[in-house]
Amino acid sequence: MLGSAALLLSSPITHAQEYMFTYSKLYTQLKNNTKEGHDDVKVGVFFVDARTKQLCAIEKAWMEKEEHYEEFVIPASKELPLPIDKNLKSANPLVFVHTPKDSRCDYSLVVMTKEPLQGSVSYEQLKPLMPQMQSMLEDLGGMFAGWFTPEVQGVTMEFANELNGKIVFSNGQEKAIVNGKVQVALSEIGEGGTITLPEPTMRVLPYLPQAKK
């Protein structure tokens, strides 16, 4: 899900692309993280390379208003770690993000799990995520989203460094991880089944096979 951002000209001092948002604009979507019923999933903010569709590195990010300034510590997942705070919404500071100068990066708002998946992952472990992801997508979509939001049928798992590998199902089947991504429907695993991952995930997103490409 893409939003809009103000793109400022690349600065010869920072050698980066700079994006600017108002905090209140981001808070409108992120406040869904505080609602009950989303115990295992959240909304995350990322930047995605418009050409390669891979995550952009965030070189620096901060918010400021008048004499107040706070820089964010960017995690390995490349997520923008914004705090969710009503007082900040009222103060409405500006949020700045620097990404590499040689890439055009689009603002990306996603529904994802709060914790990575790793090792052996069971059908029963994944099943409770489906309604939570569905609910969060519909909350983001607004009042009538339930009419048009595709059904979440599994998970899209993303791995670091554009990993090429495979996941192994407990029934002996395998599925390729290509450029760090693999999509798995819950029905492919089956009740009582498991999948084995080669390394921990970086992001786990909904799998929406009925969504328009």
List PLM regions with ranges:
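N-terminal signal peptide c-region/cleavage motif recognized by signal peptidases
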Residues: 10-11
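Solvent-exposed loop and beta-edge segments used for protein-protein assembly and interaction
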Residues: 35-39, 87-91, 149-151, 159, ...
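Short amphipathic beta-strand/extended segments with alternating polar/hydrophobic composition
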Residues: 71-77, 108-110, 170, 177
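Surface-exposed beta-loop interaction hotspot
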Residues: 91-149
